[in-house]
Amino acid sequence: MNNLNLLVVEGNIEEENKSFKQNGIPTHSESLKESLSYYTNDLNIDVFNPCSEKSFDKILPNIKKYHGLIWGGSSLNIYNDCIEIQRQISFMKECLKNIKKILAICWGMQVAVTAAGGKVKKSVNGAHIGIANDIKINNDGINHPLYKSKNKTFNSPAFNFDEVVT
């Protein structure tokens, strides 16, 4: 495998990440980097947090160098409009224009859907805490190296308050 340039986006605000670190818990972006390095060392990974950056001038000029983007979780909810969320939506719009391969996990999906004009709302069924059962891999997914050793149907830990509406 040739070295790939990946951008990992941190979704939590700096105060949340400080709290994680003070309690010996890795941030979402640190956890993603660690997981990826277990899979391969042929990655150049940069981390960016649009919550704490007042300007995207440092990253936008070189954004096309990334072969992919991974946008992970956060304790934020997209419908709780604040400047940190607005910055993330704005940055995701730039990513959607410039990076072809995007993996949006949980919070990342909320940001991507909103940036693309969709809607996310608090689930009327309450929080989903526990195990997501019977996840089915589609035909595209079955050929991806991440899923090559998985069964076509599997279970995974899940924790969600929100749902994509459109």
PLM features: what roles do these ranges have?
Residues 13, 52-54, 109, 127, ...:
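Residue-level detector of flexible, active-site-proximal loop/helix-junction positions
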Residues 74-140:
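Cysteine-nucleophile active-site neighborhood
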Residues 11, 117-166:
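Pocket-forming structural segment of enzyme catalytic cores
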Residues 58-64, 111-113, 166:
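Short loop/helix-cap segments at secondary-structure boundaries that form the rim of catalytic
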Residues 1-84, 89, 94-98:
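N-terminal beta1-alpha1 cap of cysteine-dependent amidohydrolase-like domains
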Residues 39-41, 114, 150:
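Short, structurally constrained coil/turn elements
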